[in-house]
Amino acid sequence: MTEYDYEELGLVAGLEIHQQLDTATKLFCDCPTTIREPEESDRSFTRYLHPTKSELGEIDEAALEESMVDREFEYLAYDTTCLVEEDDEPPHRVDREAMETTLEIAQLLDMSVADQVNIMRKIVVDGSNTTGFQRSMLVANDGAIETSAGPVGVEDMLLEEESCQRIEETEDGVRFSLDRLGIPLVEIGTKPDISSPEQAREAAERIGMLLRSTGKVKRGLGTIRQDVNVSIEEGARIELKGVQSLDDIDDLVRNEVRRQVELLDIAEELAERGATVGEPQDVTEVFEDTDSGVIEGALSSGGKVQGLLLSGFDGLVGREIQPDRRLGTELSDHAKRHGAGGIFHTDELPAYGVTEAEVEALRDAVGAGSEDAVAIVADDPETAELAIDAVAERAETALAGVPEETRDANEDATSRYLRPLPGAARMYPETDVPPVEPDVTEVETPELLTEKVDRYESEFDLGSGLAEQVAYGQRWPLFEALVAGEGVDPTLAAGTLESTLTELRRDDVPVENLTDKHLQGAILLVDGGDVPREGMEDLLTALAENPSLTAEEAVEQEGLGGVDESEVRDAVAEVVERHEDQVAEEGMGAFSALMGECMGALRGKADGDTVSDVLRSEIQKRA
């Protein structure tokens, strides 16, 4: 990956971190914050959404473009959702637990809390909210975090309702699920103080650590999302949305910088060529006898082929601007936003069943010369016209350089066009929910995870790796209850909650069935000597596969209770006698091979030290 002098390019970046809060109920109703499977839905309904004007009488550009795509939105409802999510009942008051957690986060970020929190409506007509807007409130501003490259300011923090979960595209539009709608969500926006890809990742990791330090945020895929705003001096501000993994942030910034540098180079070359963008025209006749499956499929359904002359663009439409993405990919993204499957262009033709003769005929039809390129869209007449107009508009912006826009992060740390940047015209006041006056007097600042790691090392004598696993994991409250409250050996508790559960998960044991009560019971039995340490995996496996059992019942069912030394000696002697020739020949050299067999014979009913001592004794008798 190309590395640039980011200071010379004038790289400026900022973050927006969206984190779901782990509250009992949703932000504006009493429904649980439980994620459901689509198959569990007991009813559904459909909506069409349209943008409304802001309080200043303006319509947001991003919302307007979204509304131009005519789509039906279907919503799956459940027995854990209500009329508030369906927009058939007014919202209730702001959830108290969500506000208290938000105030804790504000303290960790050293932010100033607003005297009065007013709820606003943010226009969103992509179907992700049944109302056509998202409720949002500014709770705090003006904070800061530290990074190795210097401080990064925190501009603001908002408490919002999470959007619907997108399930799938349908023939008429999009299917959404209401289970996620309304889960409390904090949005933390930094100031544009970030000047390198590495600092962007470090800042995101720092904020993520602070959020998890509260112990009141949801964990797992989709519960935290990062948006990254990136610009370079001669480029434009780009909002990169939906980054799921912190590991991708630095590469995403690098790839966006490369994209802007390449687009600026293309714009410079287009200017030198005197490039222009022509008017779309119907070129269906060129492809009447085509062997291209895509084009023939469109025409056989009554479709058309629209062409666009890109004067001076030859060789540039196919130029790579990000890994495996080209200027032509950018044009195609805009066509796709209007329902087309994509575009073909002459930098990649002949291909896809389009012949050399058809390419020449296409060039003749639009009057293209040797330095020109041609883009085409094949689809139903209306879609083809909308899509080719969008391609022409994006090609025009290529003449100027880098357009401001919102882009969607891809899994490979590249990005694709999503919509124009939203503006202030998307906000207006919420009239159904009264303002909130936050009370910060009783808010306690939680212990940071980094501080917790240090404490576990010093207080419980855990190694740094294990201490970090426990502190950053989800079971640290149980760990502390066992060690501080029950006097359990810290290494046993930590090793079980982290290492043992990880090993069982890799062996496809359903550890998600294990509750804190299961784990506490198992650890107490082992710590008390009722079950040998070697029996822990078998005990937890039994509980995971039969979660209705208690730890004591699982021990009895699996026969995991400890055995006395005479039973150990009998089992070990039997193993040694089966291998008497090997013992006679190798002596103590046979120890390792026989130890595993002895432990297997005892099925975790005796600890390893006892078995080891007895085995050594039995070998020495016979050697």
Curated annotation (Swiss-Prot):
Keywords assigned by UniProt? Answer: ATP-binding, Ligase, Nucleotide-binding, Protein biosynthesis
Sorted alphabetically, the Gene Ontology BP terms of this entry are: glutaminyl-tRNAGln biosynthesis via transamidation; translation
Briefly state the protein's biological role.
Allows the formation of correctly charged Gln-tRNA(Gln) through the transamidation of misacylated Glu-tRNA(Gln) in organisms which lack glutaminyl-tRNA synthetase. The reaction takes place in the presence of glutamine and ATP through an activated gamma-phospho-Glu-tRNA(Gln). The GatDE system is specific for glutamate and does not act on aspartate.
Please give the name of this protein: Glutamyl-tRNA(Gln) amidotransferase subunit E
The record's InterPro entries line, in alphabetical order, gives: Asn/Gln-tRNA_amidoTrfase_suB/E, Asn/Gln-tRNA_Trfase_suB/E_cat, Asn/Gln_amidotransferase, Asn/Gln_tRNA_amidoTrase-B-like, GAD-like_sf, GAD_dom, GatB_C_1, GatB_Yqey_C_2
Query: Gene Ontology cellular component?
Result: cytoplasm
GO molecular function, a single term? ATP binding
Query: What are its E.C. numbers?
Result: 6.3.5.-
For this protein, what reaction is catalysed? L-glutamyl-tRNA(Gln) + L-glutamine + ATP + H2O = L-glutaminyl-tRNA(Gln) + L-glutamate + ADP + phosphate + H(+)
Q: Which organism is it from?
A: Haloarcula marismortui (strain ATCC 43049 / DSM 3752 / JCM 8966 / VKM B-1809) (Halobacterium marismortui)
Quaternary organization: Heterodimer of GatD and GatE.
**Pfam families for this protein:** GAD, GatB_N, GatB_Yqey
The source's superkingdom equals Archaea
Q: Which family does it belong to?
A: Belongs to the GatB/GatE family. GatE subfamily.
